[in-house]
């Protein structure tokens, strides 16, 4: 009887250890890439005016320095009015982001600038104009590509250790009190923008709308299955909080946020 009582706990413990081992094997260790629940503040860029003019002058053949100089009589023809405005020089561009690193090839010392093109005829429906990423090596423009309306540089990484930096870029828009923010992880091999992962909507905050049922939703992005020399898998976890208790986030889902 005593022997049976001793064996029962041992068998139970062995079962528990086996179960724990199975759980550990299925759980993937994760490392934080970025948390969109956090409040973010961006310090003003400190780029000398002469440098700004040099950069913009190499990206755009013609541009304006003041919105007041936009031609109110300008009429864009064709199916792409923003392109027509750029061609006509009816733009008021500004530099909104900057990062140094190796973007087009390993070992390069480069600076990437995010530029809000500011087409004169751009409306709220156009997200107030297109955005571009311009990469310079010293004074030489080596890449000029569309930034898909992204204006914020959230982080710079080299996740697979290939010597090329990736950027986590985001961009947002508010309409009738609802803030929507999207994000993507991109790199620029050989000067071409490549989307590594499009995270879609990472912030949806309707608290400012005052509508019934308003809430805030935000994504947290993790790295999983990280191995040397390989791009890790990316995991999205979504959370929500009420407008009354904005700091009390509750887990909502995994994967891209449902719109």
What kind of region is each of these model predictions?
Residues 102-116, 158-173, 223-238:
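Acidic/hydrophobic-patterned starts of short beta strands in beta-sheet-rich repeat architectures
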Residues 80-97, 145-154, 202-218:
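Repeat-based blade/solenoid architectures
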Residues 88-90, 119-127, 173-178, 211-212:
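Short consensus segments that form the blades of beta-propeller domains
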Residues 98-101, 133-134, 154-157, 183-186, ...:
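Hydrophobic/aromatic beta-strand elements that line small-molecule binding cavities or substrate pockets
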Residues 4-12:
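Sec-dependent N-terminal signal peptides
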Residues 129-133, 140-142, 147, 155-160, ...:
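Long, charged/polar, surface-exposed segments that mediate recognition or autoinhibition
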Residues 108-154:
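A glycine-rich, hydrophobic loop/mini-helix early in the fold
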């Amino acid at each position: 009887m005593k022997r049976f009582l001793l064996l029962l706990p041992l068998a139970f413990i062995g079962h528990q250890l086996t179960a724990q081992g199975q759980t550990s094997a299925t759980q993937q260790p994760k490392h934080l890439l970025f948390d969109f629940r956090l409040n973010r503040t961006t310090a003003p860029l400190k780029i000398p005016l002469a440098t700004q003019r040099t950069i913009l002058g190499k990206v755009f053949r013609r541009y304006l320095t003041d919105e007041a100089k936009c031609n109110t009589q300008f009429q864009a023809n064709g199916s792409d009015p923003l392109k027509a405005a750029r061609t006509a020089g009816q733009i008021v561009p500004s530099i909104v982001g900057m990062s140094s690193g190796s973007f087009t090839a390993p070992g390069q010392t480069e600076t990437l600038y995010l530029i809000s093109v500011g087409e004169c005829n751009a409306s709220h429906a156009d997200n107030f104009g297109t955005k571009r990423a311009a990469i310079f090596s010293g004074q030489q423009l080596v890449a000029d590509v569309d930034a898909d309306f992204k204006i914020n540089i959230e982080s710079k990484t080299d996740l697979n250790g290939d010597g090329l930096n990736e950027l986590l870029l985001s961009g947002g828009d508010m309409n009738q009190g609802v803030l929507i923010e999207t994000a993507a992880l991109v790199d620029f091999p050989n000067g071409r923008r490549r989307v590594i992962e499009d995270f879609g909507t990472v912030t949806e905050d309707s608290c400012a709308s005052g509508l019934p049922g308003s809430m805030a939703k935000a994504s947290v992005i993790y790295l999983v299955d990280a191995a040397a020399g390989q791009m890790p898998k990316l995991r999205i976890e979504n959370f929500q909080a009420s407008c009354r208790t904005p700091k009390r986030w509750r887990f909502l889902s995994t994967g891209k946020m449902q719109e």
